[in-house]
Regions:
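Active-site region of chymotrypsin-like
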Residues: 30-39, 104-111, 136-189
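C-terminal segment of classical bacterial N-terminal signal peptides
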Residues: 14-20
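Conserved beta-strand and immediately adjacent loop positions that scaffold enzyme active sites
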Residues: 34-36, 51, 73-75, 97, ...
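N-terminal activation segment of mature serine protease catalytic domains
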Residues: 20-64, 73
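Sec-dependent N-terminal signal peptides
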Residues: 4-14
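Conserved active-site neighborhood of the chymotrypsin/trypsin-like protease fold
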Residues: 56-129, 134-138, 153-156, 166
Length: 189
């Protein structure tokens, strides 16, 4: 029994080591651009929590619009645990559940994700980077299942991976480490 347990444990450790070795090189740097969003309502009571990510080094960020509904104020908490206030809403679209806002950054610049220079094609490998304060290189890998174009220049992607609740509003990245989408729940979810 001990031999089976030891063998199973060893295999699990090898699988973890292998998956860590397979992480793209850009994951460590990119994960620092992902943060947690906390919105507050009346009497400074927590209203919602979720995720977001920086798209510019001067504090412009994206998240899902529904987090901010009814909020009096909001803060973001970066991967190092530093809390920064949301200072302005730059744009919002409740139909597509996306919000663009500016954060009052506490340093000269923050880590930001670069936008994709080309739209990924069906079958392309993609990665979702969840928010984490840990130094791990975790991500979720998948592929583009469907890429639908709308409004002549935008794309809506369906991915063949299981989206956990904690992954909503996290960046979806190309193999080159460029962000091309904001993870959202399926409309049927």
């Amino acid at each position: 029994m001990k031999k089976k347990f030891f063998l199973l444990s060893a295999l699990c450790l090898l699988e973890v080591q292998w998956s860590m070795a397979q992480a793209p090189k850009w994951v460590d740097k990119a994960k620092r651009a992902v943060f947690s969003v906390i919105t507050y309502g009346e009497n400074d009571k927590i209203l919602n929590t979720g995720n977001g990510f920086f798209v510019t080094e001067d504090g412009v960020a994206l998240s899902d619009c529904s987090l901010f509904e009814g909020a009096q104020r909001a803060v973001v908490v970066n991967s190092e645990g530093v809390q920064m206030p949301v200072v302005s809403i730059m744009g919002a679209n409740d139909m597509y559940d996306v919000i663009k806002f500016r954060v009052g950054i506490s340093t000269k610049k923050v880590p930001a994700l670069n936008p994709a220079t080309a739209a990924p094609t069906v079958g392309a490998n993609v990665y979702i980077l969840p928010y984490s304060t840990q130094k791990d290189r975790s991500y979720t890998a998948g592929q583009v299942k469907v890429a639908d174009e709308f409004s002549g220049k935008y794309h809506y992607y369906t991915l063949n991976l299981r989206l956990k609740d904690k992954m909503v509003s996290c960046p979806v990245m190309t193999e080159e480490g460029q962000v091309f989408a904001l993870a959202q729940k399926s409309s049927g979810a």
